[in-house]
């Protein structure tokens, strides 16, 4: 009985037990509610195939889609003083930081990298909205300065992807100081004659919009991105009026001259390659090395025809 209960029964149960299915295989579009398979969503750069809604994307995922072959190297960012104000609300600031690091796997809200797009060397920086709302603190200020200094040192253009709710309240006046600091960093690029291209993604608001996010030589946005200083709800409550449809969205800003382009995420890399090379005075990008073609199926050699028999050996030969 022990052999049956200890070995046979568990073996049978394991054969017929329900397999565990990972929870993240499917994702629901927040706009239209369509259930999307994770691999299909990833291949489409996290854009809904039903309604074209652009979902949030991490800096690493963005860089893998941007750089040639997904290859890039990170630029080191100086770490600022941790919790300079000893800030505490419902949680202590260090506790919030630990939770954000654990949730995202990143040390802070911005990633800086260098690599090539269309064989054109660039420096890129991207904010991570999932890290405390992408809020601009001392680290983000240091990251933008590091990106600008690296771009100037290597004589490369800087492409920045913004996604933030504004300044980080836990750092108080020190976070607001990053507005002039990052503005000076952008000025370094302009004085060096290097292109500075900004891609505004959903959402870009507050002090980020009031500083480095709106200082690009070329301003591009993803479709339907919210781009503003104060949000529409705050404005409606202040002026007590209904705002126009699509107010502060990318398409509205494009129509009113605040943006140069609104570009679908799937077309963004090609657009950035064209604009970057144009601003650098270079010709059209050279198509990268194409993968080797699939080997053609081996065609069987034609069988050699059997040698014809001599006339005298053929049946009926010599008969009259």
Curated annotation (Swiss-Prot):
Q: Where does the record place the CoA carboxyltransferase N-terminal domain?
A: 25-294
Region described as Disordered: 290-320
- According to its UniProt record, where is this protein located? Cytoplasm
Q: Which GO terms describe its cellular component?
A: acetate CoA-transferase complex
Entry's cofactor comment:
Binds 1 zinc ion per subunit.
Give a single Pfam family match: Zn_ribbon_ACC
Q: Name one GO molecular function term.
A: carboxyl- or carbamoyltransferase activity
- Per the annotation, which location comes first and is thus the protein's main one? cytoplasm
Cell inner membrane in keyword set: no
EC code: 2.1.3.15
User: What exactly does this protein do?
Assistant: Component of the acetyl coenzyme A carboxylase (ACC) complex. Biotin carboxylase (BC) catalyzes the carboxylation of biotin on its carrier protein (BCCP) and then the CO(2) group is transferred by the transcarboxylase to acetyl-CoA to form malonyl-CoA.
Q: How does it assemble?
A: Acetyl-CoA carboxylase is a heterohexamer composed of biotin carboxyl carrier protein (AccB), biotin carboxylase (AccC) and two subunits each of ACCase subunit alpha (AccA) and ACCase subunit beta (AccD).
Provide the protein name.
Answer: Acetyl-coenzyme A carboxylase carboxyl transferase subunit beta
Source organism of this protein record = Dinoroseobacter shibae (strain DSM 16493 / NCIMB 14021 / DFL 12)
């Amino acid at each position: 009985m022990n052999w049956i209960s200890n070995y046979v029964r568990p073996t049978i149960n394991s054969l017929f037990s329900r397999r565990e299915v990972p929870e993240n295989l499917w994702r629901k579009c927040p706009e239209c509610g369509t259930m999307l398979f994770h691999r299909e969503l990833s291949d489409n750069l996290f854009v809904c195939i039903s309604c074209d809604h652009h979902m949030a994307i991490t800096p690493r995922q963005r860089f893998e889609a941007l750089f040639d072959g997904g290859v890039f190297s990170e630029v080191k960012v100086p770490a600022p003083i941790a919790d300079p104000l000893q800030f505490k609300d419902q949680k202590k600031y260090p506790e919030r930081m630990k939770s954000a690091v654990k949730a995202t796997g990143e040390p802070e809200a911005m990633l800086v990298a260098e690599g090539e797009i269309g064989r054109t060397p660039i420096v890129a920086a991207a904010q991570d909205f999932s890290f405390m709302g992408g809020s601009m603190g001392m680290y983000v200020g240091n990251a933008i300065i590091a990106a600008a200094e690296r771009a100037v040192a290597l004589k490369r253009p800087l492409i920045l992807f913004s996604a933030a709710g504004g300044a980080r309240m836990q750092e108080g006046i020190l976070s607001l100081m990053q507005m002039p600091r990052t503005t000076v960093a952008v000025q370094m690029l302009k004085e060096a004659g290097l292109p500075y291209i900004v891609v505004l993604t959903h959402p870009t608001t507050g002090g980020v919009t009031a500083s480095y996010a709106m200082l690009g030589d070329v301003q591009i946005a993803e479709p339907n991105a919210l781009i503003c200083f104060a949000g529409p709800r705050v404005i409606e409550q202040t002026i007590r009026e209904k705002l126009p449809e699509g107010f502060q969205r990318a398409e509205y800003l494009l129509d009113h001259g605040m943006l140069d382009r609104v570009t679908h995420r799937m077309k963004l890399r090609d657009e950035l390659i064209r604009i970057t090379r144009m601003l650098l005075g270079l010709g059209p990008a050279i198509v990268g090395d194409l993968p080797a073609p699939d080997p053609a199926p081996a065609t069987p050699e034609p069988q050699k025809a059997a040698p014809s028999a001599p006339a005298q050996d053929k049946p009926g030969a010599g008969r009259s």
